[in-house]
């Protein structure tokens, strides 16, 4: 039994779980026999595949595409997602396709994998172990976990969980950034149970004692229900003393399979944990565990098997990479200016490069030699992760933790027309159903009370009214804060009251879709912009960007507004790149006076870099800040004008406090983030919530509310219009009109909120499968061309997408519109036409021209683009092929349910997409084409909808193949002719001083012409070359000149050699070119080099040319000619037919003499305007095919028509008196 061999390849510990699967799949051997019966020669398989393909469908051969041998394979097999060539599986492709479909129908993904295993074991037994490891074992392990989950819960894994499982079994470490309710903790508990049963040691790290208990119970429940043998140890602060002691003893001795603790245990016991040799580390809610310090990252890595010195080396490497890019940019700036410091910076850059190489080699050796644990970081938000310390994880484990998005919103916003007061808040809380409330007090409210004081008063008032409320602010002890949040999550606390601070723990860090139902704002969230800024304000990039953004909205002058918004936008981009960039910028401008800083706005970045002794990269940012300060100072120089503009704007208010004046603007970001706590993404979609904003009938407050509504509508749009309660709002003078929401409508909205929370509860309790919600049911891989586009697409759905560093590229991950989305880029074309075999890389198979492609690459030395070779044919350098990138894309494809090819929506993009499709290899995923015409949230969302998915457009692909073949057959052939005809002559005279008189003489064969002669200069020169005049003296070309600039003197000449006297592209004859030179009258021996100009190109064949070719081909097919060759000596005429059984008319053999041949030859050589004497024309002077003009004979109009329509052979037949047709 072939499947018995598969069982032998299963890693120890898992075999008892695999055997039932193999027993269920025993019928696959019968299916395999059906395929084996169609065995035939590989060439016959390919011929059949090509011959049976519709003529309208593109067909090609792709080199380096077989997943087994790495050889070439036909697109017929590759686009059938088989991925194995005809030599490795010499069976009928159509039968194989049908049987694979049947195997999947019977046994799912694992059925396909095992069927392929049986066939590979039969035909390619030497490669079966590699095939099992890469393709079969991931599916088998996923099936194991799936069946365990089914036995324990009655549910099967859903798509994202299958992706995580496949990724884990392949030995990857990775991060999971997925919404609450998508089953991260369930999946982690499940794989922990399976790994523990197989004898692998697992460490499950969680942030709280509550989660320790939950995970412990879940793992033990899985083990009990699925009959797994798993020894679980949990440790937390709430355990009895004796239980703690026993747990510590078992941990110290390693007497467990799965260990579950909080992060506090990790902090205090890391030395004990790093001795235990874990196989898998699961970090649940990673942002909570590493919040506030990166040292927990180091501790996790130590437990994974790394030494602290190695972790520090990884951190040093991440720091050096940033330093490298900074130095590189600075060096370019110094070199451009000719600054003498360039050599010092260049030496430092070399030192940094050397250290980077050493550290990369060290870490590569560590990862190869050390048996490190796999690490999985899980998070619903990821927002609080300290990215600088996590750079260590990127260097060691090739992935990054991302951050979730805040753009998803399903909220009804309601303006409550009432003076903010505890009583007003209580009324709204009761109207909203009490439980699940978040009350936010904005900062800088009118009055003397601070926001923190109001928070405490509100909480106290609600508690005295019978509503369980807790206050949370910066002064709340961490334990009380955690207790309040846990109580809110469990339903013991009704309401949380907090400050609406953009960085508050409730505003940014609360992700409880099952608990948070509604939000109440104790006034409109706002920011204040000082209209009389201090010097330290103007040197703060955040203040300048914020002030410019808000003041720009007040301006009616479109050009001025656009200018301010442009500067503010550039500053925001700098700020968002990271704290360290802002710190460097502030450090650079700190010593400068404001006047000096503003003067830098008009200076060149290179001058700024020299003045401040910084790199050009930072100098550009300093210039941007200086420009912002100048614009802001100019605008704030007239406070009365600013106040007048604010009055006209109707969306902001001016607030005066003593001698200080402030501009109050709505804080949209804080409002969106805070209200977003009641509308969270989970496995069933986005929860519905309510947001109430208390606002008094005061014009200044209403202006701020109006600004909030308008900016929110402009920035995000809204599915629901703002409403007002308990009455309508009509302020036409400021453009604010809101429709009243009735008590009945409000009650209906509250019911909708409750229904949504019940659905969340069922998903979290396992009573409702994620698939039953219709959302997040599938994992998708989107393939685009540009890396920037890939990053932008993922960023549309996530603040900071998770990143996986691939071999040759980067993949980005995010939850997007019901899909677990991974985006990767091809970085342009991945394949191109080879030069051989066939006719310039085009084969003839079964009466069809079939192009052959191979993987593209680029020479690391000369930059030459190379196809299918690891050695550059131009310079012999090493070629960096795209094979590693394609292998990585194959790995990603093996994890996905659906693959979306999102290359550019044109013929070239279609062809790139088709090439990638062919290189996907063997995959169980469905492959579709999707298009988008704008990289916006709306554009990508449309492309991700299933109704937008389609097949690759065969017509577009065929059009691009035709264009490329035409380029090769015509353009490439013409280019080779150019290489034969044009030669490059280089004459080096060596180092010469300025003022030297030079004479150069060229003696070249007759018929060779010098079409260009010039002096070339080195790369550092601003002028790369200068034309030099040649004179003809007898048989020689002569140059006489005095050089004004000394240095290395080199001349180059372009020679036109139509008769190829100097050789061709395959070799030249330099001895035929004689060069004599003298300097200041003294002969010198120049260094002379002659070579074909192989860098010349005839260019691409454009569409009109293709049209002409198609028209001529059609005429050729529709025109019948006799094909023959005439050999004439003397009186004997021999006709040799080039087609069988050609019947040659007797008249032709009688009249085709030497004179006729001479006439025809001259017309063939000179064309229809060829002229003849009367003697040359002979007996044809009287025919209608010739006419006489000025004593000479040439073809008549009738003769020209014959020549044009029937060619020279047709004219020959007419001259012989025989019909040309």
Curated annotation (Swiss-Prot):
Single Gene Ontology MF annotation: ATP binding
Span of zinc fingers (RG C-terminal-type): 856-882
Motif DEAD box: chain residues: 284-287
Annotated residues for binding of Zn(2+) 1: 66, 69, 85, 88
Keywords: ATP-binding, Cytoplasm, Isomerase, Magnesium, Metal-binding, Nucleotide-binding, Repeat, Zinc, Zinc-finger
InterPro entries, alphabetized: DEAD/DEAH_box_helicase_dom, Helicase_ATP-bd, Helicase_C-like, P-loop_NTPase, Reverse_gyrase, Topo_IA_2, Topo_IA_cen, Topo_IA_cen_sub1
Record's keyword annotation contains ATP-binding: yes
Free-text description of this protein's post-translational modifications in UniProt: The N-terminus is partially blocked.
Topo IA-type catalytic domain ranges (all copies): 953-1221
Chain sites annotated for binding Mg(2+): 785, 904
E.C. numbers: 5.6.2.-
Binding of ATP, residues: 161, 178-185
Cellular component GO terms, alphabetical: cytoplasm
Toprim domain location: 779-935
Pfam families: DEAD, Helicase_C, Toprim
SUPFAM superfamilies tied to this protein: P-loop containing nucleoside triphosphate hydrolases (SSF52540), Prokaryotic type I DNA topoisomerase (SSF56712)
Cross-referenced NCBIfam families: rgy (TIGR01054)
Classification via PANTHER family: REVERSE GYRASE
Domain notes: Introduction of positive supercoils requires the cooperation of both the helicase-like and topoisomerase domains of the 2 subunits. The helicase-like domain probably does not directly unwind DNA, but more likely acts by driving ATP-dependent conformational changes within the whole enzyme.
Protein family (similarity comment): In the C-terminal section; belongs to the type IA topoisomerase family.
Biological role: Modifies the topological state of DNA by introducing positive supercoils in an ATP-dependent process; dATP also allows positive supercoiling. Increases the linking number in steps of +1. Only this subunit binds ATP, it does so in a DNA- and RgyA-independent manner. Hydrolyzes ATP only in the presence of DNA. The RgyA subunit transiently cleaves a single DNA strand and remains covalently bound to the 5' DNA end probably through a tyrosine residue. It changes linking number in steps of one, and nicks DNA preferentially at 5'-CNNN | 3'-sites with a strong preference for 4 pyrimidine residues. This subunit expressed in E.coli only has DNA-dependent ATPase activity at 80 degrees Celsius. Reverse gyrase activity is reconstituted after incubation at 80 degrees Celsius for 5 minutes, positive supercoiling requires ATP and Mg(2+). In the presence of ATP it binds and nicks substrate but does not make closed product.
Protein name, per record: Reverse gyrase subunit B
Originating species: Methanopyrus kandleri (strain AV19 / DSM 6324 / JCM 9639 / NBRC 100938)
């Amino acid at each position: 039994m072939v499947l018995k061999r598969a069982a032998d390849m299963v890693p120890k510990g898992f075999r008892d779980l695999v055997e039932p699967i193999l027993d269920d799949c025993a019928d696959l051997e019968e299916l395999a026999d059906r395929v084996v019966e169609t065995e035939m020669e590989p060439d016959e398989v390919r011929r059949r595949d090509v011959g049976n393909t519709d003529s309208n469908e593109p067909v090609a051969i792709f080199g380096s595409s077989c997943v087994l041998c790495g050889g070439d394979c036909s697109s017929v097999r590759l686009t059938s997602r088989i991925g194995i060539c005809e030599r490795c599986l010499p069976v009928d492709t159509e039968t194989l396709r049908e049987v694979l479909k049947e195997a999947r129908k019977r046994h799912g993904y694992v059925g396909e994998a095992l069927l392929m295993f049986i066939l590979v074991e039969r035909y390619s037994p030497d490669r079966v172990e590699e095939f099992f490891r890469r393709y079969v074992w991931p599916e088998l392990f996923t099936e194991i976990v799936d069946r365990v989950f089914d036995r324990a819960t009655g549910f099967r894994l859903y798509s994202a969980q299958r992706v995580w499982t496949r990724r884990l079994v392949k030995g990857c470490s990775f991060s999971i950034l997925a919404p609450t309710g998508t089953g991260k903790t369930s999946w982690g508990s499940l794989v922990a149970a399976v790994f523990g049963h197989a004898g692998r040691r697992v460490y499950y790290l969680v942030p709280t004692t509550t989660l320790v208990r939950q995970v412990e119970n879940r793992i033990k429940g899985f083990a009990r229900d699925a009959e797994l043998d798993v020894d679980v140890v949990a440790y937390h602060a709430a355990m009895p003393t004796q239980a703690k002691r026993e747990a510590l003893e078992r941990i110290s001795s390693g007497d467990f399979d799965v260990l579950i603790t909080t992060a506090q245990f990790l902090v205090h016991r890391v030395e004990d944990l790093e001795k235990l040799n874990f196989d898998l580390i699961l970090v649940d809610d990673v942002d909570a565990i590493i919040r506030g310090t990166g040292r927990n990252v180091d501790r996790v890595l130590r437990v994974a098997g790394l030494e602290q010195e190695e972790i520090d080396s990884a951190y040093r490497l991440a720091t050096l990479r940033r330093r490298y890019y900074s130095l590189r940019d600075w060096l370019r700036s110094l070199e451009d200016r000719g600054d003498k410091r360039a050599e010092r910076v260049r030496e430092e850059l070399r030192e940094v490069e050397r250290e980077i190489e050493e550290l990369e080699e060290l870490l590569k050796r560590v990862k190869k030699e050390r048996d490190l644990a796999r690490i999985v970081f899980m998070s619903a938000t990821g927002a609080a992760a300290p990215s600088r310390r996590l750079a260590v994880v990127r260097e060691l484990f090739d992935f990054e933790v991302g951050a979730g998005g805040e753009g998803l919103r399903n909220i009804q916003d309601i303006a409550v027309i009432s003076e903010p007061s505890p009583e007003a808040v209580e009324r709204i809380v009761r109207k909203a159903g009490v439980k699940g409330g978040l009350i936010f007090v904005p900062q800088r409210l009118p009055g003397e009370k601070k926001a923190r004081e109001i928070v405490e008063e509100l909480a106290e008032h609600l508690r005295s009214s019978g509503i369980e409320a807790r206050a949370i602010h910066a002064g709340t002890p961490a334990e009380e804060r955690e207790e309040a949040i846990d109580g809110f999550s469990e339903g013991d606390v009704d309401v949380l009251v907090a400050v609406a601070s953009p960085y508050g723990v409730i505003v940014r860090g609360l992700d409880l879709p099952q608990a948070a139902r509604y939000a109440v704002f104790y006034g409109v969230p706002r920011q204040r912009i000082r209209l009389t800024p201090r010097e330290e304000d103007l040197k703060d990039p955040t203040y300048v960007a914020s002030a410019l953004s808000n003041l720009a909205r007040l301006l009616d002058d479109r050009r001025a507004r656009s200018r301010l918004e442009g500067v503010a936008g550039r500053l925001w981009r700098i700020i968002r790149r990271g704290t360290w960039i802002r710190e460097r910028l502030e450090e650079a401008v700190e010593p400068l006076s404001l006047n000096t800083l503003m003067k830098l706005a008009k200076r060149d970045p290179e001058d700024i870099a020299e003045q401040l002794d910084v790199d050009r990269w930072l100098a550009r940012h300093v210039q941007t800040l200086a420009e912002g300060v100048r614009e802001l100072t100019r605008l704030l120089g007239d406070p009365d004008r600013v106040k007048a503009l604010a009055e006209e704007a109707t969306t902001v208010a001016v607030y005066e406090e003593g001698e200080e004046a402030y501009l109050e603007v709505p804080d949209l970001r804080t409002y969106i983030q805070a209200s977003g706590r009641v509308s969270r993404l989970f496995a069933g979609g986005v929860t519905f919530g309510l947001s109430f904003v208390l606002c008094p009938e005061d014009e200044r407050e209403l202006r701020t509310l109006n600004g909030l509504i308008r900016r929110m509508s402009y920035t995000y749009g809204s599915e629901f219009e703002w409403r007002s309660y308990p009455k309508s709002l009509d302020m036409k003078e400021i453009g604010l009109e809101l429709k009243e929401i009735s008590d009945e409508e409000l009650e209906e909205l509250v019911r909708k909120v409750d229904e949504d929370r019940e659905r969340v509860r069922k998903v979290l309790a396992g009573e409702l499968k994620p698939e039953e919600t219709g959302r997040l049911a599938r994992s998708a891989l989107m393939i685009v061309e540009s890396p920037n586009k890939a990053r932008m697409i993922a960023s549309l759905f996530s603040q900071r997408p998770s990143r996986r560093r691939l071999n040759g590229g980067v993949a980005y991950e995010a939850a997007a519109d019901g899909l677990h989305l991974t985006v990767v880029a091809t970085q342009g074309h991945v394949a191109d036409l080879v030069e051989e075999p066939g006719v310039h890389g085009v084969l003839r198979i079964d009466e069809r021209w079939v192009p052959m492609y191979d993987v593209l690459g680029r020479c690391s030395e000369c930059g030459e683009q190379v196809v299918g070779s690891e050695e550059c044919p131009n310079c012999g350098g090493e070629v960096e092929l795209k094979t590693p990138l394609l292998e990585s894309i194959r790995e990603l494809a093996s994890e996905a349910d659906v693959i979306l090819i999102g290359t550019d929506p044109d013929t070239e993009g279609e062809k790139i997409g088709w090439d990638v499709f062919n290189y996907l290899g063997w995959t169980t995923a469905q492959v579709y084409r999707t298009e988008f015409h704008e990289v916006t949230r709306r554009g990508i969302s449309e492309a991700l909808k299933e109704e937008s998915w389609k097949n690759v457009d065969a017509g577009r692909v065929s059009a691009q193949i035709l264009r490329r073949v035409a380029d090769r057959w015509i353009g490439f052939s013409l280019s080779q002719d150019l290489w034969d005809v044009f030669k490059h002559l280089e004459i080096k005279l060596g180092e010469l001083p300025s003022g030297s008189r030079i004479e150069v003489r060229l003696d070249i064969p007759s018929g060779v012409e010098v079409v260009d002669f010039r002096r070339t200069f080195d790369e550092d020169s601003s002028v790369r070359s200068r034309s030099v005049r040649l004179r003809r003296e007898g048989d020689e070309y002569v140059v006489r000149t005095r050089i004004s600039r000394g240095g290395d003197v080199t001349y180059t000449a372009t020679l036109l050699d139509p008769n190829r006297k100097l050789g061709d592209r395959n070799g030249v004859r330099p001895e035929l070119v004689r060069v004599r030179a003298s300097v200041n009258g003294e002969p010198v021996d120049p260094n002379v080099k002659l070579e074909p100009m192989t860098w010349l190109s005839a260019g691409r064949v454009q569409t009109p040319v293709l049209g002409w070719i198609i028209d001529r081909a059609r005429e050729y097919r529709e025109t019948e000619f006799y094909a023959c060759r005439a050999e004439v000596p003397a009186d004997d005429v021999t006709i040799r037919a080039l087609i069988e059984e050609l019947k040659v008319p007797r008249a032709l053999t009688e009249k085709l003499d030497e004179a006729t041949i001479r006439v025809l030859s001259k017309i063939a050589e000179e064309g229809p305007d060829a002229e003849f004497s009367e003697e040359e024309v002979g007996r044809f002077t009287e025919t209608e095919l010739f006419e006489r003009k000025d004593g000479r004979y040439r073809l008549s109009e009738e003769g020209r028509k014959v020549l044009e329509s029937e060619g020279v052979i047709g004219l020959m037949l007419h001259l012989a008196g025989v019909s040309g047709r």
